[in-house]
Structures are given as C-alpha cells and as structure tokens.
C-alpha cells in the first residue's frame, strides 16, 4: 500500500522499507540504505550510490537495485511540494520474437521514446503522402487524361449537366492539349483549337468546362481525318480525338442538333476520299491497276483502323447499353433509327466505293477488256486481277440496295469471269 511519506513492499519472507530524503536540485550524490528485516532484526544488505547531473529544476531520481534485472518499473521522485510516489517515465518495450532468442523487457529512456514517437509520426505522414493517386502516374507527352479516363472507364456521367459532372470529362480538357505547334499546324482548325485552351478556369484544383459549339470541335476532327487520308501523321493521340469527339456529341445534344451528325459524317468521308481519288489521275494505264491496289492497301490497313479509333465514342457512348440509360429519349430514338448511317466502318467502305472506285470504273473495264484480248495477259497480271477481285467483292458486300451496289457487283463479276476463263 502506498503512503504519503513512505513506500513499503511486504511479503511473507521479507520487508523492504524505503525512506525518501528531501533533496534540492543541485545534489552530487545520494546514498540510500536498504534494510532487510527478518524475524524482527534489521540487516544492512547493501548501499547503492547513484549520481545525477544538475539539469535545471529536474528532480533527483533514485535507482534502487531490485529483483527486476536491476531495474524498478517505477521509482520515487521527491520534491519540495509533494512526497507522493510518482511513476518513472520509463517505457518498457518488448523485443520482436525471433527464433532462438528470448523475449526480454528492456526500458527505454524518455528521450528515446520521444525520438520513436517523432519517427512514427514522420512515417505516418509519409505513408499518407504515398496514398496520393498521382504518385505512380508517369508523365505523359501530350494530353494528361486522368480526368478523361475516369469518365470514359469509370462512373457513368456522360452528357450530364456541368453542375453535376463538371462537363463530360468530370474535368475539362487539360492545358497540355494546347501547344503552339498544334495550333499553328491545324490551319482552318487553329481558331477552334485555340478556343479549347480558353475554356479552362481553376476552381479548387479542378477545371470546369465552358460550352463549346459543335462547329468548333468538328473542325478539329475533320482536319485530323483528312490528314489520315492524305498520309500524314496525327497531330495528337487517339485519346485526345476521342475526347474532342465527345465534346462534339455533347454540344449536338445540348443544342438538339443530333440529326446533323449523319450529314457531318457523310461530308467528312466524301471530302477525305477525294484526296485518294486525286492521286490516281496522273497514273498511266499500264500502272493503273497496281496503283489501285496500293491505294486500297493503304486505306484498308492504315487509314480505316485509325478512323474507327477516332470515332470509337460513337459506339461506346451512343450504343452502349449502360450509357444509353443516361441519354435523352430523343437521342436514343435517333441512334436506333440511324444505326447503319452511324456505322463508321460501313460508311468508310461505302464512301470508298462511291467516290474512289466507281468514278474510275470505266478505266477498270478498259483494263479488263485489254486483258481478255491479249494472249497470255494473265500470266503477268494474274495476281493483280486476283487482288482486284478481292477489293471489288469486299466493296460489293456493303448493302445499300441502289444502283451503285449493282454497278460494283457487275464489275466484280467481270473480273471473276476473267480469272475463271484464264
């Protein structure tokens, strides 16, 4: 039991009496005598002498030898105002358990405890910093699409109000989209693209999107698609173009002009295909069929996949079953009615047929007639006509139920008969 002036620890075998001394702050040494009394007799066992440095107004600590490996888990602090026993600021730590070693309790000084607490606090702060979603994000050339990817692949906030979703992306187009090189290289689309750089305004570390007209966004898409048909490289990635096309779709729906989108697509592919047809005009007759095959391979293997990638949001945003629930009823009706007209793959093939092959059908028939009249003509040009038949057959598979479909079918039949006759 702890008293005000003394501390005693009793047992059936021994009794330890400890009497505090009134000490001041500057004490060089303190001697404590521990007496052990047994059967009414006190015997002096040992005297433990401890020294303590003079540090300000710090109290004097007595270290008493005890059965606890020479350390007491608590000690007595004496002061001028109170003689109550005070627990020592010694923290007992348990070593980690390792095979072949015993778990030993060792005291830790207050200074070490403070250092450990500070170290743990620092590690906690660092761990919180490591939770940042941008820590492992690698820098990327061109557009930073963290907000765009969150919208396209994450929550379904497509075409919601700006107050609810902060625009189509959740956030707006990053500033990295707009560079002088891109603006200067766009020509007719430069003004529209420059306006994209002005629609961003900072708000709590994010960016809101100011509405852009459909004409401004479409100029950019049109310029890039025409560049593909001309054999030029894209000015920026497909992800950027997907984002701009989504802006265009949102502007059309906001202005209730979705019915104009089909006309935009038809005009675009007609204009782009004209770039290919112009390249066949100066070609001589003996190289004409070879140039047609080369142009087709370029279109089918290089242009068409990228064009489908540019217009991917048409499939993922207008015809996706989950995304359709976020669209207005009128938009869903329009898309279901014009599904074939919004099929970019079909539209590109049909435009290639109508504005690339059919205008030169007469020249193709002349080449076929020359091959039929010449002896052993297919020995040298057999592979060329075989490839031509593949091209015409694929274009004839585009069903439009009009005279153009019938004309390309007849042309494919003539080439097939030539191959069979040989």
Swiss-Prot record:
One of its GO terms (cellular component) is cytosol. This is Target of rapamycin complex 2 subunit bit61. It comes from Schizosaccharomyces pombe (strain 972 / ATCC 24843) (Fission yeast). Component of TORC2, which regulates multiple cellular processes to control cell growth in response to environmental signals. TORC2 is required for cell survival under various stress conditions. TORC2 positively controls G1 cell-cycle arrest, sexual development and amino acid uptake. Positively regulates amino acid uptake through the control of expression of amino acid permeases. Either Thr-23, Thr-25 or Ser-26 and Ser-78 or Ser-79 are phosphorylated as well. Its main location: cytoplasm. Keywords: Cell cycle, Cytoplasm, Meiosis, Nucleus, Phosphoprotein. GO terms for molecular function: protein kinase regulator activity. The gene is bit61. Residues 48-69 have a biased composition (Polar residues). It is found in: Cytoplasm; Nucleus. Pfam families: HbrB (PF08539). The target of rapamycin complex 2 (TORC2) is composed of at least bit61, pop3/wat1, sin1, ste20 and tor1. The keyword Phosphoprotein applies. Belongs to the BIT61 family. One of its GO terms (biological process) is meiotic cell cycle. The modification Phosphoserine is found at residues 109, 132, 201. Residues 48-101 are annotated as: Disordered.
